[in-house]
């Protein structure tokens, strides 16, 4: 799923909140950080489901931005270590410390049509939302079943880590519609590219 915010499309196809946060740093080298200003972070938190849709996060500032980037880096190091069979104790210590705080307080409220919907008992602070993401990382990293489905995307120029819940766990890409489709297009082009030679010189294919 993607949601447009300015010129950037958020993607939430990694399967977990903490993985989606880590994926915001998974661009190609030299690309701009999508979490480059407070309003982008506020939008991401809402779209990612860290708070109920429609929640106003007017208190998000540069301090929040720094702290969420630090958490993102720690989660990314933990994921890389997990996939490589290594330890990342410094990153683990940071995530555990953030997870120890209380997450946002949830409550059920009446919507306009009378249905109960998820709401918040108080306006969430930075520490509470960091705790929500950090606790998701702790839950993931201590769940043997989930860990068995942890994968690194095989797409070109993509390093997203995702949760493979497909039958047989044979999924190769973070998103079949994005990285998977790119691979299929590239494979099609390779199959139909005319071999180099005199005929190729007469009519070069469109780029």
Predicted regions mapped to residue ranges:
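Basic DNA-binding region of bZIP-type proteins
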Residues: 178-195
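Cysteine-rich micro-motifs
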Residues: 168-180
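Short, intrinsically disordered low-complexity segments
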Residues: 159, 168-169, 183, 190, ...
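Cys/His-rich metal-chelating microdomains
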Residues: 156-161, 177, 182
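Short helix-coil boundary/hinge micro-motifs
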Residues: 1-152, 159-160, 194-207
């Amino acid at each position: 799923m993607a949601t447009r915010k300015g010129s950037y499309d958020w993607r939430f196809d990694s399967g977990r909140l903490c993985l989606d946060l880590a994926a915001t740093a998974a661009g190609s080298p030299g690309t701009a950080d999508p979490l480059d200003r407070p309003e982008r972070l506020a939008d991401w938190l809402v779209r990612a489901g860290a708070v109920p849709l429609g929640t106003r996060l007017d208190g998000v500032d540069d301090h929040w931005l720094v702290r969420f980037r630090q958490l993102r880096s720690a989660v990314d190091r933990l994921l890389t270590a997990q996939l490589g069979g290594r330890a990342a104790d410094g990153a683990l210590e940071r995530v555990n410390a953030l997870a120890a705080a209380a997450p946002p307080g949830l409550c059920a409220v009446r919507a306009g049509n009378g249905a109960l919907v998820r709401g918040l008992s108080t306006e969430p602070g930075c520490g509470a939302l960091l705790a929500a993401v950090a606790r998701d990382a702790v839950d993931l990293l201590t769940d043997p079943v989930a860990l068995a489905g942890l994968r690194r995307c095989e797409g070109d120029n993509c390093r997203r880590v995702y949760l493979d819940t497909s039958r047989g766990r044979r999924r190769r890409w973070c998103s079949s519609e994005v990285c998977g489709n790119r691979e299929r297009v590239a494979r099609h082009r390779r199959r139909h590219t005319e071999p180099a030679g005199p005929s190729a010189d007469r009519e070069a294919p469109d780029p």
